[in-house]
Structure formats: structure tokens, C-alpha cells
Amino acid sequence: MKKLLLLTAIAGVFAFSNVKAQDAAMSGPKLGVGVEFGFPMGDFGDIYNLSVGGSLLYQHPIANKLNFTANAGYLNFTGKDYELAGVTVAAKDLGVIPVKAGLRYFLAENFFVNGEVGAVFGTKDGFGTRFAYAPGLGVEFPVADKSSIELGARYEGWTKGDGSVTPQTIGLRLAWNFGL
């Protein structure tokens, strides 16, 4: 039994001696396909529940550990009943199309911080177009030579610049990234 254990340990050492950690930061251009969840905050959270949607995120290395990002997607916020001047109002669902660009910096092998700015377009009358900003962080878990699973979180705000309420959300993204 001891010989079997020793042989297994030796085989394990040789089997993994050539394994290198994969670095998600500099693996070349890649495209990520993700599912997104948003949790509305503040006054926006009084009117809307959880949002669900999807996104495409392109990354291109521009320096050591630094990637340019371009991101587009769709989110649907489900409306909820709320009180306005003593009257119960049912909010209609809100669909938005965020389009953003930014930078992703890898702090460690697969852990990153990012910042994006852009525009968010409402799919219904009355929302219009708003300036979007989104700082975040996350991790990419390499699963193959040019493929990774990404888990990210961000704060996102959309402002019109006219003094109206700025919708704010905490967003989560689960994505599959693949090299191009």
C-alpha cells in the first residue's frame, strides 16, 4: 500500500511539473458572451426589481496587464407596484441597451478592476439616452488555452444631466470568454 501511495505521488509530480498558470490578462483579443443581473438601488429600486439580460464584451490588450474593452447588451428591469401620493402605481418593465467602452487592468494573474463609460438607451418612450459609468472588479478562471469563465461585479449609474433621478444598480456578470 505504501509503495502504491509513493508511486502515485511521484506520478503526480511528473504529471504536473510542466503545467503553467494561464494568464488571462495577455492571452490576446477575446470576446465574452455573458448573462447579466442588476439589482436596482435608491429611488430606482423603489420602482424596479431585479434585471436580467445579456451582453457581449470585447477585450483587446493594449499594454502589460491592461486591456481595452467594448461592451454592448440588453437588460430588462421588471416593474413593481409603488406608492405615489397615496396611490398605488404599477411600474411597467423597462428595457435598456447599454453601450460602453473602457479599460480592464489585471491586478494579479486573473483578478481585474475595470472602468467603463458610454451611453444607455431606453427601449420605451420617456427614458431617452443617458450617460453611463460603471466601475467594477472580477476574476477570470482559465478553462482552456484560449477560454475562460468570468465572474464580475460592478456599480453602474446612468445620468441625464438634467437633475432627474440617476438610476443606480449593482450588476453581476457571468460570462464565457474565448480567444479570437
Q: Can you say where each PLM-predicted feature lies in the sequence?
A:
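Cleavable N-terminal export/targeting peptides
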Residues: 1-28, 180
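Short glycine/proline- and aromatic-enriched beta-strand/turn motifs that initiate or cap beta-hairpins
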Residues: 20-69, 75, 167-180
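Predominantly the C-terminal beta-signal and adjacent terminal strand-loop region
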Residues: 26, 78-81, 133-180
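Membrane-embedded beta-strand positions of outer-membrane beta-barrel proteins
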Residues: 31-35, 70-72, 101-103, 113-115, ...
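Short beta-strand segments enriched in hydrophobic/aromatic residues
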Residues: 37, 60-62, 74-76, 107, ...
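Repeated loop/turn-to-beta-strand initiation elements of outer-membrane beta-barrel proteins
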Residues: 64-68, 110-113, 143-149, 180
